[in-house]
């Protein structure tokens, strides 16, 4: 089945149980049961997480509707009080990247794409024009190619471009507006989104963080967003030809973001699968998507992704340019690359990774490395430089690239083509020489009001990570840093989502603005749906840990809410407040599957007799009883019935405590240990058992 078949199957009006079936997803016959479950789940584009609903916060105008996920919480049980009088817990609001796929009031049709959220904002500024058609040679040729007609996205709008001003190229970047004091709807949207209704939360307590020079106000305002973009400390990646995208911001004074890589290769994957990966990734919290396709139909794949993506899409244009010269790096030219930039900008790519810092003089510095040049883009440009013995056209034509990007508001992601591929190669002169060049290029881009972020490593031991962050801030004048990990050890293939998340949490704390996720398949193979989810959840943990360490305003509120639910044995709320409710619930139900256990005052770790939190609650009740007794003695006569009631309450609680922490508990502990010893010998004295 081809992508053209999706339309009849995916066009549906959403309901709470609706599913938009993109049945063109390919599922290998040999897949495991777990893989099959994840593939099936990924087809259901509309499934929202438990106890959640999509809500919108309106801005200063009716068309600024900022999406959030509202999590409904159960009331707090109060012993001896009717359920109708239990303490009510307000709903909790979290940042939501899933787009309208989880909106029950939206019709999803993948063949038509998402609603054009930003279209009117772009038009009303009056500084863009709609072209008569595609202006890139390759785009025009592709449109005439009948062999790809069945793969083509059917509803392609004519692209927009900045109007010329006084005979010069126009500029429509968010940085251009910000530097002129203009607060755009995108900036207001972001301010609401970043604040996450935190002022309405009940428990905003948190520890003071270590910011390493970052400065974030208690409430994010549109003016603060504007000032950060104007200074170059943050970027808003929003191409005018991707009006479907929901505005977001990348900068160290905002929430740490994560990026998910997808893309086909010559070895496999289809357009259908890439669209499915994108919707799956954004459902679990990917803030950005990079399409790293290198296989067939790169142009068509990208069109489908952009038209259906609620988050910014980034690419590495040199990959497609290389395909146009049949993979021969030496045959690349500025003209081919320029045409590729225009082609992708007119499709709506929000940011380009461009390895303009790979200079001829840096290439020999990699000769003594253990793993040489590991960046695909870096190796392509290094080979070109050596073949022609001159600086790459990415470097010599950098200002020409800026002229293109400011007409569409495409942001730079200046690539680290000489990043280290192992711990041994970290922080060498090749890596840091390129970083200093990226700092110089940042100033050139800012001269054109083009937004910039800087890519970073890689593989770096923990004790050497901060040196990377400090040098980046110094040489790149606080431009946002965007890193792959870094991996903190090289000995754990299959677990590199963990080795890299350790480094990601650290460098995020030190000031990195966006973390590129790593899946368990890193260095081993192409990730499936489960790998994508595992990578995203792992990196959401790292990003959140960094926000906590920085003391980002409101960052700890979700931790407080979940901890309160845990202490009060509100099991469903614990699951629903988690980053991955499905897995939390699944693990709990493996040992305590009954519905009654969802309200039990214990878990399978300690059991009903030895739950530390239940004992603590009893201690609190005991203390409260003592206070009630003391207060009653001080306020009523000895003959009062209230005094008898208070004494009865304290005796009851006292008895409960003795049962749990006194001699009875000790006897039960010894009896339980004896029973488990007997069971251990009876079952063959095996440390581990097959399950």
Curated annotation (Swiss-Prot):
**Where is the stretch described as Disordered?**
1-38
Domain of life (superkingdom): Bacteria
Residues involved in substrate binding: 261, 290, 319, 355, 375-377, 416-419, 455, 482
Q: What cofactor does this one take?
A: [4Fe-4S] cluster
Gene3D superfamilies from the UniProt entry:
6.10.250.620, Radical SAM ThiC family, central domain (3.20.20.540)
Under which EC number(s) is this enzyme classified? 4.1.99.17
Cofactor binding notes: Binds 1 [4Fe-4S] cluster per subunit. The cluster is coordinated with 3 cysteines and an exchangeable S-adenosyl-L-methionine.
Ranges of Low complexity composition bias in the record: 10-27
An example of a Gene Ontology cellular component annotation for this protein is: cytosol
Which catalysed reactions does the entry list for this protein?
5-amino-1-(5-phospho-beta-D-ribosyl)imidazole + S-adenosyl-L-methionine = 4-amino-2-methyl-5-(phosphooxymethyl)pyrimidine + CO + 5'-deoxyadenosine + formate + L-methionine + 3 H(+)
Q: Give the residues the record marks as binding Zn(2+).
A: 459, 523
Enumerate the UniProt keywords alphabetically.
4Fe-4S, Iron, Iron-sulfur, Lyase, Metal-binding, S-adenosyl-L-methionine, Thiamine biosynthesis, Zinc
Q: Pathway membership of this protein?
A: Cofactor biosynthesis; thiamine diphosphate biosynthesis
Q: Which GO terms describe its biological process?
A: thiamine biosynthetic process; thiamine diphosphate biosynthetic process
InterPro entries, per database record: ThiC, ThiC-associated_dom, ThiC/Bza_core_dom, ThiC/BzaA/B
Say if the entry is tagged with keyword Iron-sulfur. Answer: yes
Supply one GO molecular-function term.
Answer: 4 iron, 4 sulfur cluster binding
Annotated residues that bind [4Fe-4S] cluster are located at 603, 606, 611
Q: How does it assemble?
A: Homodimer.
Q: What's this protein's family per the entry?
A: Belongs to the ThiC family.
Q: What does this protein do?
A: Catalyzes the synthesis of the hydroxymethylpyrimidine phosphate (HMP-P) moiety of thiamine from aminoimidazole ribotide (AIR) in a radical S-adenosyl-L-methionine (SAM)-dependent reaction.
Q: What is this protein called?
A: Phosphomethylpyrimidine synthase
